[in-house]
Amino acid sequence: MTDAYIVSALRTPVGRKKGSLASMHPADLGAIPLKETFNRVSLDPALVEDVIYGCVDTVGPQAGDIARTCWLVAGLPDCVPGTTVDRQCGSSQQAVHFAAQAIMSGTSDIVIAGGVQNMNMIPISYAMIAGQQLGFENPFHDSPGWIDRYGKTEVSQFNSANMIAEKWDISREDMEIFAQSSHEKAISAIDNGLFEDEIVPVGEFLHDETPRRDTTLERMAELNPVIEGQIITAAVSSQNADGAASILILSLIHISEPTRPS
């Protein structure tokens, strides 16, 4: 089994709700790190064997295989295929795993993985309700098998998060301390330029908008839970955000001598 190597990892800054990327079409957003990849790496893009992007809520401007759409919008060769992965919040991570597995199995040598999402344009979980105009309240509506197993209890990320917290004895205070630390680390990394090599500016938009400089544990403690009686609040939940990333993964045979790992 061969090894897989990440030789380029680029991303846009992350835009907040109603922020700098809110009106950018997902295909144009996803094209940005793809274009820059080939500005920085000496590689013929026509040699790429697959483009695997993660994206949740693949409806509207994110439908129609957004991975390939981003590639084409970037002006890259139309002989290269693309596919889109939906593993919910782990979609882009799964795209990277699939790319690495393709290389490690020997079926591919050059693959791009990444992801794109504009949550301002396509709100979170919109795909879950998109079938309502066709008479489907949600993806599980009127499925006898689903109802036999789970009943009609609402399917919710917040319920799931609360179940995990209960199973592993994670308190609200534990989560808030972790969230506060996460914001502080992100802000420190921004202020010290640690993200500069990986971020591709979008016009004059240079830095992530999502880390909160003004948040405190005291402010977090004042928030009401999303679901009454539970402990999950907005402060410990992922934000609505927009962004894209592109990672170039190669087999050893395609890595030039100067960049070959020792």
Locate predicted features:
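Conserved active-site "lid/cap" helical segment
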Residues: M1-A74, P81, C89, M163-R172, ...
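N-terminal extracellular/periplasmic Venus flytrap/periplasmic-binding protein-like
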Residues: L10-T12, S23-I32, R40, D174-L252
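Active-site pocket-shaping loop/turn-to-helix segments
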Residues: R11-N39, D57-G60, T83-H97, N120, ...
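Conserved catalytic cysteine-centered active-site region
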Residues: C55-D109, G151-Q157, D214-Q239
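Active-site-proximal alpha-helical scaffold in enzymes
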Residues: R87-Q117, A165-L194, I247-L252
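Flexible glycine-/small-residue-enriched beta->alpha junction loops
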Residues: I110-M163
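Single conserved hydrophobic/aromatic residue that forms the stacking wall/gate
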Residues: I253-S262
